[in-house]
Amino acid sequence: MTIRLHIRPMKWKGACAYVDEHHRHHDPPQGHQFSLGVLTESGLLVGVAIVGRPVSRVFDNGLTIEVTRCATDGTPNACSALYAAAWRTARSAGYRRAITYTQDGESGASLRAAGWRKVADLPARPGWHAPSRPRRPRGTENVARALWEITTHNAPPLPELRDETRDETRPPRRRCAARPCRHLVPATGTGRPARYCSQACRQRAYRNRKTPQP
């Protein structure tokens, strides 16, 4: 027998509590634009979707929204109902693209059933931890993902899918070792990291090393 499902708005705390209890590999996100719940006819909550700004800055253009969490108790068609409702809500608010990700090994059947399409397979990434912004491991590091989208007819082209590593995860820029310069040293693509910002600083440092100290 097919279970009839209904969509309703969810408050932030309630959606996060459901994700915390039912999501397989993610904690609740840090924020949202809106959240939705899916209920049976008896009023039992069987799933939630949390929708917010895109995590990747490549997509954060004001016209794109991301389903950052979708969690259910396994009720048939609950996921596809949430993805479809998330897009209806976003489109009515003026968004032209919605995106989400699945992990390697997930079929995406619920997304296809809701009209979404897979647009890219993304390689595994090491995670978001950085010295300037510590993040605890979440168990999702080094897992390949797939990017999915659904769009309006007038959506802008999909942006270039460059490396999604954030700036704070990149190695810190060095400062010139020649005193008293201390300018930032240009980054090198390969080889040993540069120590000096210019040839003049390199020569000055060499002379200082060779000059006998009083």
Positions of predicted regions on the chain:
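BZIP DNA-binding basic region
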Residues: 164-214
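Short amphipathic alpha-helix that is part of the acyltransferase structural core
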Residues: 1-30
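A broadly conserved sequence feature marking short terminus-proximal activation segments
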Residues: 151-170
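A residue-level signal for beta-strand positions that form part of recognition/binding surfaces
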Residues: 4, 64, 145, 173, ...
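Class I (Rossmann-like) S-adenosyl-L-methionine-dependent methyltransferase catalytic domain
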Residues: 141-147
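Short Cys/His-centered divalent metal-binding micro-motifs
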Residues: 119, 150-154, 201-208
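Conserved beta-hairpin
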Residues: 19, 32-49
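Acyl-donor binding region in acyl/amide transferases
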Residues: 6-9, 33, 40, 52-140
